Amino acid sequence: MSDVFELENEIELESDEVILENENVEEIVDAPIPFSMTTNNGIERGKFRSLTLINWNGFFARTFDLDELVTTLSGGNGAGKSTTMAGFVTALIPDLTLLHFRNTTEAGSTGGSRDKGLHGKLRPGVCYAVLDTINSRHQRILVGVRLQQIAGRDKKVDLKTFSIQGVELSQNPTALFTETVGEHQARVLNLNELKDKIENIGAQFKQYHSITDYHGMMFDLGIIPKRLRSASDRSKFYKLIEASLYGGISSAITRSLRDYLLPENLGVRKAFQDMESALRENRMTLEAIKVTQSDRDLFKHLITETTNYVASDYMRNANERRGNIEAALESRREWYKAKAEQNLSQHRLVDLSREVAELAESERTLEVDHQSAVDHLNLVLNALRHQEKITRYQEDIAELTERLEEQKMVVEDANDALEESQAQFEQTEIEIDAVRSQLADYQQALDAQQTRALQYQQAIAALEKAKTLCGLADLSVKNVEDYHAEFDAHAESLTETVLELEHKMSISEAAKSQFDKAYQLVCKIAGEMPRSTAWESAKELLREYPSQKLQAQQTPQLRTKLHELEQRYAQQQSAVKLLNDFNQRANLSLQTAEELEDYHAEQEALIEDISARLSEQVENRSTLRQKRENLTALYDENARKAPAWLTAQAALERLEQQSGERFEHSQDVMNFMQSQLVKERELTMQRDQLEQKRLHLDEQISRLSQPDGSEDPRLNMLAERFGGVLLSELYDDVTIEDAPYFSALYGPSRHAIVVRDLNAVREQLAQLEDCPDDLYLIEGDPTAFDDSVLSAQELELGVVVQVSDRELRYSRFPEIPLFGCAAREKRLEELQIERDEVAEQHAQIAFDVQKCQRLHEHFSQFVGLHLALAFQPNPEALMSEINRERNEIDRELNQFNSGEQQLRIQLDNAKERLQLLNKLIPQLNVLADEDLIDRIEECREQLDIAEQDEYFIRQHGVTLSQLEPIANSLQSDPENYEGLKNELTQAIERQKQVQQRVFALADVVQRKPHFGYEDAGQAETSELNEKLRQRLEQMQAQRDTQREQVRQKQSQFAEYNRVLIQLQSSYDSKYQLLNELIGEISDLGVRADDGAEERARIRRDELHQQLSTSRQRRSYVEKQLTLIESEADNLNRLIRKTERDYKTQRELVVAAKVSWCVVLRLSRNSDMEKRLNRRELAYLSADELRSMSDKALGALRTAVADNEYLRDSLRVSEDSRKPENKVRFFIAVYQHLRERIRQDIIKTDDPIDAIEQMEIELSRLTAELTGREKKLAISSESVANIMRKTIQREQNRIRMLNQGLQNIAFGQVKSVRLVVNIRDTHAMLLDALSGQQDEYQDLFNDNRITFSEAMAKLYQRINPHIDMGQRTAQTIGEELLDYRNYLELEVEVFRGADGWLRAESGALSTGEAIGTGMSILLMVVQSWEEESRRIRGKDIVPCRLLFLDEAARLDGKSISTLFELCERLDMQLLIAAPENISPEKGTTYKLVRKIAGNQEYVHVVGLRGFGATE
């Protein structure tokens, strides 16, 4: 029976409405078979009813009813099969990041690749893809997606998911999404309109804003097999659908079969995570304890820093107060001492002022004399320098005069030679020009006759020239030689005349030069005068010259004599002044030498006496100072020991407070430590006993806490192995009243295992390896077990059981029955109470042990640090005694200092008087010379005359010595010098004229042959030409030589002339300077003799010495005076300052007393004085204490930053003007810490003791939690066992899946199976986890890392060749806790003669690969359903549907196999195939794409399987 139905659509779009023009539905022959649902364990599986496509390309409004098994889409290429499947997949997984339809009409286009093949399958406007499903609860759910193309070049598609529930089964999905607007017209509703329409019909419409929510709804309602929580889950599902759609073996699935087939073992992972979290929590508790310890350290730090902050300021104020009092007393002593010194300085000031006035008057006189001596010395030095220059210049001028005369003669000779050379050169030039002109004429002639004519003309020209120069009109060729000889003789006579005149001229020049020189010397000495009187003046000067020279030679002796007399006179004046000064200072009137010598002896004796007394006092003072230094060293030693001694005393006092004992000697401390060791051993034994008892109770509690009541965990394993139940588990609900009876009834067998068949178990007993010593087995039905198996009689105190015919067992009722849950819970409660009591006792004893240990530790620290000093004498008492002795020595030293000062003053005065006497006594004989002044005047007159002659000789001596040999030349004046000079000039001119005439006549003589030339041959012309050329060359060479000579003589003349000019210039400048120097030395007015400088210098030095001595004395006295005045000012200032300081210090002492009283009152009332008055700090400086306080303040600011009250109190305490605020802050800190003390745990009010007890308690808690951590630690062996069991379970499950694949055959493939193996690297990890290799256990015993990290490190250690990448150890460890990572899954097929092969597309045909791939996918879906069964509703069995496109790749047998597989597994299948598929089963749709006009649509004909039977 087959039903045929047909629906034809023609679609036309007009504006916003879609018009349905034609809808032709053929009548179905019979009513359709109702949609049936198969059952799965009594629960029907959900099914997909239909697929509806609205406004898709070719489908305006088409609903495809889906068969319960196989739905086939048949049609040619481009009929719309892939579009239909794409609509189904889009509604199932509406994720644009995953959708990719490769089989599309837009294949190869860039747009198609961008929209993943979806954009081209839609028409403009709103589109829908809707799935109509019915689940196991018979609920109809429509799920789908609204699609709409987005305008733009990217061809994007917008998707919105929704679901509809509550729609009647009779309602057609197409009618829901369209609205009829005419008889043959309809339009598509948008999403809002659809929502309103659904609500109007009473159904529920829901839109989803995320794909996760959409898939969550589909999973909960049984549409998809697995909950898709993430994009990764959606990707897996899509890959499965894609693999199903395109057929074949998907490498994406086969590579990750573990993720598809093996369920995630969340329970195991959660157990591991819980264990790790418990360990983490325990470690966090330990960290919290460490934090508490750090808080304790913070409190300890707070107490320490607060004590340092306040105690350092407290001691600094105490030191300052004591220092202020001492400073006030010291200021008062200095005040009185300054007043006494002021009185002494005033008397001394008067004496020194009188002496300064006398010294100032004497110094003014000496300064005038000294300045005069300095000026005189400067004049003498200037005169000597001028005289030296004059002498030097006179010598230079004499030398220059001689050189100048010589140079003039040289210049004149050079000039004459130059003129002669130039004349010769000019004559040679004339001859060369003549020869060159003749030669040129010869060369220009065309023939010999022309040359002759030219020579003749030149000869005639030369003859005319000679006539003109010589003035000879009758000159001819015949007489030319005679005239030439005449003129040549005349020229020689003129040359002799010139030479004679030059000789006379040189003699005249020498006489004139000597007369001029002598005349200049006379004028230089006597001044300008006529030349005629020069001889008389020279005679007078030379006559007086010898006597003046003799007188000048006596000048040094006279000057020395005058100097000696003046020096003696200066000594006489100095001696007079020294005597007056001595008498004035000594207040005496001594005049004679005897009186001065007697007084000198008296002063020497006085100095010796005073020196002896001073030496004695110095020795006594040195002894006292040495004693004081010894006392100071002893004081410093005790001062260094004092802080350590005080610290030791404080530590000893704390130990006495903690121990309640009094220690008088170091041996007492050692004895107490020994007793503490004995007490600690006793307490430790008690603590260990209580610990053992607590552990025993914990073990009992742990054993009774088992849920089934088994005391041995091995029994549970055996019960599971034998398939039985523990007897204790069967009687778990027995009442507490019946528990003693049943416990006695079963006796030792109360832990037996109840099994159904003892015979079956008996065979396994021989194979048992690990079991209790006594194992009881009872045969019976665990679901209906009673105690009838035993023959028993109840007595008063027990039960008698007939074990066998010859054996009875009597069991007394136990006092503490443990049979049944109620009895165990009661016993657990009792044990818990007892354990808590034992734990409390253990805690108390442990606390006492810790206390003893801490006390012993404190004593050990005291012994190591302070025992050597704690029992020594008090250093402060010794320091006080030393201070008293030092004060006595200081008083004696002051007395010695005052006496020594007076003696030193007397000694200085005596030494000063003795020094003056030593200077005065050697000069007494000078005072008796009375005629010294007359001798000085006489010597000075003689010296003046001698110095005048000496000056004249010095000024003109050189000139006179030059004048003396040439003075006779002044007798005759050479006046004919100018006449000779003119005559010589005229002779030279005549000589030049005659020489020119001789040259002209010589030229005519040379050309005489030319006059006879008339008809000579060519050879003669050439010979003459050659001669002319040779002559020209000779004359040119001669000219070059003469030119070079002229050039050399010109340069020589220029050089001689330059030297002459330099000498003349030097002579003029030095002569001028000489005259200037002579004038200057005359202006100075002093005599520049040899001894003048020495006398002036000696006089100056003597006056300077006297002035220096006077100035030194005056400077010393003025310094003393200034010192006294400054001391007086300083004393006045000191008096005012000391008075002011005394009053200021007194006011400070009075002002600080008020604040100090408040500090003392606060510290004493709060019992804090002992904590603040730390005597060891008294030895630190104020800066050190302030630095300690500042450092503590900085630490406290950080410590109390979170406590507002303490922070404010600290801020107030920072005011240095109110130290009492620091004490208040100290009290506040202690009060705050007292409030923080838990009085239920710590039995003290003292924060320091509380911190000590807190430390002990925290140590105990740390030990307990460390032990708990060891109990909580995960065993690596247990992890390995869990992993192995889980892997074994999953291997069994895979074997069950393989049973369903055994009979699947496609082509040559006869069977398919899954192969699961454990990876070698992970198998090594499991072996290592089992504990067989102890070297790896260090990782799991390390508390610093988690168990997961330990597993990761172990995996890296046993597999060092594997690169872990950038992943952390925790991530790797978590992966290793997932059993799936231990397994490798592969798919194998049994194919023909090849046997079992790995399932790969390359090894199989297309049909075989499709069938094998479909089998794998079915297995994955089935696995997903089983995996999700726990989290899905129990009344839900999900839909199961797969796809297959292009099914023509399968043969008919494979298609039948596929259909059979779907029927057996209750699965729906949607396949697409060409028209050659026979629709024998399921439902087949024939799709044909047609075009009517400009409209395109798909014609669909549905055919339900004709091979089906009713």
Curated annotation (Swiss-Prot):
Coiled coil location: 346-706, 825-1154, 1248-1304
Record keyword Endoplasmic reticulum present: no
Annotated Pfam families: MukB, MukB_hinge, SbcC_Walker_B
Main location: cytoplasm
Region called Flexible hinge, residue ranges: 707-824
Compartments reported by the entry: Cytoplasm, Nucleoid
GO terms for biological process, alphabetical: cell division; chromosome condensation; chromosome segregation; DNA replication
Source taxon at top rank: Bacteria
InterPro entries from the UniProt entry: MukB, MukB/SMC, MukB_hinge, MukB_hinge_sf, MukB_N_dom, P-loop_NTPase
GO cellular component entries: cytoplasm; nucleoid
An example Gene Ontology molecular-function term: DNA binding
Keywords: ATP-binding, Cell cycle, Cell division, Chromosome partition, Coiled coil, Cytoplasm, DNA condensation, DNA-binding, Nucleotide-binding
UniProt: ATP binding residues: G75, G76, N77, G78, A79, G80, K81, S82
Domain comment quoted from the record: The hinge domain, which separates the large intramolecular coiled coil regions, allows the homodimerization, forming a V-shaped homodimer.
HAMAP family recorded: MukB
Described purpose of this protein according to its UniProt entry: Plays a central role in chromosome condensation, segregation and cell cycle progression. Functions as a homodimer, which is essential for chromosome partition. Involved in negative DNA supercoiling in vivo, and by this means organize and compact chromosomes. May achieve or facilitate chromosome segregation by condensation DNA from both sides of a centrally located replisome during cell division.
SUBUNIT field: Homodimerization via its hinge domain. Binds to DNA via its C-terminal region. Interacts, and probably forms a ternary complex, with MukE and MukF via its C-terminal region. The complex formation is stimulated by calcium or magnesium. Interacts with tubulin-related protein FtsZ.
UniProt record similarity statement: Belongs to the SMC family. MukB subfamily.
Identification of the protein by name: Chromosome partition protein MukB
Name of encoding gene: mukB
